[in-house]
Amino acid sequence: MSLLHCENSCGSSQSESDCCAAMAASSCGAAAKDDGVSGTASTGNLSSSFMEEIQGYDVEFDPPLESKYECPICLMALREAVQTPCGHRFCKACIIKSIRDAGHKCPVDNEILLENQLFPDNFAKREILSLTVKCPNVGCLHKMELRHLEDHQAHCEFALMNCPQCQRPFQKCQLNIHILKECPRRQVSCVNCAVSMAFEDKEIHDQNCPLANVICEYCNTVLIREQMPNHYDLDCPTAPVPCTFSTFGCHEKMQRNHLARHLQENTQSHMRMMAQALQGLSLAVAPVPQRDMLPYDSSPLSRISSGCCSDQNFQETIQQLEGRLVRQDHQIRELTAKMETQSMYVSELKRTIRSLEDKVAEIEAQQCNGIYIWKIGNFGMHLKSQEEEKPVVIHSPGFYTGKPGYKLCMRLHLQLPTAQRCANYISLFVHTMQGEYDSHLPWPFQGTIRLTILDQSEAPIRQNHEEIMDAKPELLAFQRPTIPRNPKGFGYVTFMHLDALRQRTFIKDDTLLVRCEVSTRFDMGSLRREGFQPRSTDSGT
């Protein structure tokens, strides 16, 4: 019966694809060869790799798979479909494993079933391979016939591949970005020494790189790391050093630039220490017999240590040392005078630099033309101080409304949680300042001021928080200042609540942006034309 089915299968496979024909012919040949032997012998001749074949197709069909194409054993689409004499269809690997494990019977109706009674169902195979399936890779929307699924998966951009460096799985479309920018094992180079390393090792390397710039902990000089030991030992003016006479008993430590002054102020005490040390040395050394003496050395210290110098030689040695100390004292005085001259020169240079910096800041302030954006960095630190009920008051640099124009600045105050009626609010005020053009401007100041906390999100439409206020000439806040900054300010005690500050991206990279736009009485109509109406303000001190 089995042979008859195989011959029919072989005969019908001539019109199918070469693959189906080859499989049918192979199956028929195996059946014909096994026809003359028992079922047990047939089972023993099959390769053990048969048992390792996978089960049915575990993919999503569109439309869903019909039940007639499901394997009763694995409940998936038939793979290499075979049919039994009793008319049931199974995956080839599933039914062979069932026969070998559970016995020679059909799993559906328990009819006697041998392996050599199975024959390929090429019709079912062709029908199943023609069904439409969805790509199983997450994110891929492609659909194809089942026979093309394997080729598609080999090129699918959403297929998972292991990173060759860290072995983590990623989709093909994301793998290049991961390898180039995200992988902890990607190769990077040190900007200082050009050594290549894995990114995850870069932090440790940066802490030990011999060519990295480091700051001296004593004088704040910037040097490369490999130069720092010599800098500490020889050059650093503020590094702590012991006194030159420490071996003679002076235990003072001081900054290197104070050493000369210390030697100058303590010359006499250092001489006493040396004399006491030399006297103790001469008393401690016993006379040495002539036959045990070392070769003669004419240096003062060698004569003392040899134990053979006379009292006269000892006095001469002390006189020589005192003369050397006097010469060193003169040298120290000269070096001290030079150092004081250099210190005065450096102080003058610092004053000049500060003056130039002030002039540059003044010129930059004049370029604002009434629009100034104040960048407040480390804002998280200010918020933490506010939560700890520490006062937070920050003033912006000065800026001009034009050239010529009024000079103003902003003041931001984070109200404490315990403040009455304004707890946890941002207070924002404007102060007038003494400027270069005050004598040419009309006083008191008159105009309109728009204060804005900028939304730093990437949204196309940003929701800034802003208020507009009109100057009130009768208030002291708008009179001509008599000191560098008018202590009276004008603005809002309750400009914005801190809870509202956290609802959108007002803080980005730990920075808050506050914008101030000022229109004097000559151009204040521009703000009103935009449709903004000022609300009542609170003057502050």
Curated annotation (Swiss-Prot):
Coiled coil: 312-367
Top-level taxonomic group: Eukaryota
Biological process according to GO: antigen processing and presentation of exogenous peptide antigen via MHC class II; antiviral innate immune response; autophagosome assembly; bone resorption; canonical NF-kappaB signal transduction; CD40 signaling pathway; cytoplasmic pattern recognition receptor signaling pathway; DNA damage response
Disulfide bridge partners, by residue number: none
Post-translational modification: Sumoylated on Lys-125, Lys-143 and Lys-472 with SUMO1.
Catalytic activity, EC: 2.3.2.27
Molecular function terms, GO-annotated: histone deacetylase binding; identical protein binding; protein kinase B binding; signaling adaptor activity; tumor necrosis factor receptor binding; ubiquitin conjugating enzyme binding; ubiquitin protein ligase activity; ubiquitin-protein transferase activity
Known pathway: Protein modification; protein ubiquitination
Function statement: E3 ubiquitin ligase that, together with UBE2N and UBE2V1, mediates the synthesis of 'Lys-63'-linked-polyubiquitin chains conjugated to proteins, such as ECSIT, IKBKG, IRAK1, AKT1 and AKT2. Also mediates ubiquitination of free/unanchored polyubiquitin chain that leads to MAP3K7 activation. Leads to the activation of NF-kappa-B and JUN. Seems to also play a role in dendritic cells (DCs) maturation and/or activation. Represses c-Myb-mediated transactivation, in B-lymphocytes.
Name recorded for this polypeptide: TNF receptor-associated factor 6
Organism this protein belongs to: Sus scrofa (Pig)
